[in-house]
């Protein structure tokens, strides 16, 4: 069973074909709009939508050619329906349903976060079994779930303000780095020369619940930097180090609490921040010390991509989910 997946929720146009029968990714293509939006310091929704329109047909032809298949080979077309930029979502959904109508192929709506939650399954070497705890950590979301079976997700905790990835990007902006700055913060942190120069707070780390807060940490970075008389490259690196240590410490602590609270031994990490080296290193230590199994997506599938939508769509279609009409029903915000 071959499923075409279409991701267009923000500033990446991603398409992929997933084979549900063999549980393998057949092919995928991705176009990133980062360079387009960089000069504006963030994503411009109207530009994002127009760029999706310009690229979707081109990328579809490229994907089918790379996979050496045609539309007649497809069982289903999956597309991101929520959450995301409403215009961008409408472009992807309309494109998917049009293809489905023309070629008489079923379509299925996919929740973007479900795609991220299942993305570690793209690593064929991972033997992930239910149930497990999942941390979804990205620029738009920081949430902990208990996943009992496919489609059975219980929210354990989430950020009450900024997402972790958002805090990384805003810290980068405060320190004069270009968009998107999360990776730059992480890279500069590795060049710190005085790792004890700054001591930043770890909001809600010791709270008994599983919620997060990163707004206060971001404000602490702002106040620390603006009061610093020596705003040198070295001190910028030192502050990036302190910020990253604080943010990752909170994430790892909450993950451990979630595992203890639910009694699970398996932890899945997904979303853009799951590519962070320090996060992976700290969780690897946790795994070795406490005997937990921890799973990540392949590095190239941490950020938004079509592969995770094709995979999630394949699982949904196999579980009898599909669109019943041609209505375009997309949502900017939606819980999983």
Curated annotation (Swiss-Prot):
A Pfam family recorded for this sequence: TsaD
Keyword Metal-binding: yes
Entry annotated with the keyword Thylakoid: no
Source domain of life: Bacteria
GO cellular component assignments: cytoplasm
Recorded GO MF terms: iron ion binding; N(6)-L-threonylcarbamoyladenine synthase activity
Residues the entry annotates as binding substrate: 136-140, 169, 182, 276
CC cofactor: Fe(2+)
Cofactor binding note of this UniProt entry: Binds 1 Fe(2+) ion per subunit.
CDD domains named among the record's database cross-references: ASKHA_NBD_TsaD_bac
Keywords assigned: Acyltransferase, Cytoplasm, Iron, Metal-binding, Transferase, tRNA processing
Subcellular location: Cytoplasm
EC number: 2.3.1.234
GO BP field: tRNA threonylcarbamoyladenosine modification
InterPro entries (alphabetical): ATPase_NBD, Gcp-like_dom, KAE1/TsaD, TsaD
Record: residues binding Fe cation: 112, 116, 304
Catalytic activity: L-threonylcarbamoyladenylate + adenosine(37) in tRNA = N(6)-L-threonylcarbamoyladenosine(37) in tRNA + AMP + H(+)
Its job: Required for the formation of a threonylcarbamoyl group on adenosine at position 37 (t(6)A37) in tRNAs that read codons beginning with adenine. Is involved in the transfer of the threonylcarbamoyl moiety of threonylcarbamoyl-AMP (TC-AMP) to the N6 group of A37, together with TsaE and TsaB. TsaD likely plays a direct catalytic role in this reaction.
Family note: Belongs to the KAE1 / TsaD family.
Protein name from the UniProt record: tRNA N6-adenosine threonylcarbamoyltransferase
Species assigned in the record: Francisella philomiragia subsp. philomiragia (strain ATCC 25017 / CCUG 19701 / FSC 153 / O#319-036)
The gene coding this protein: tsaD
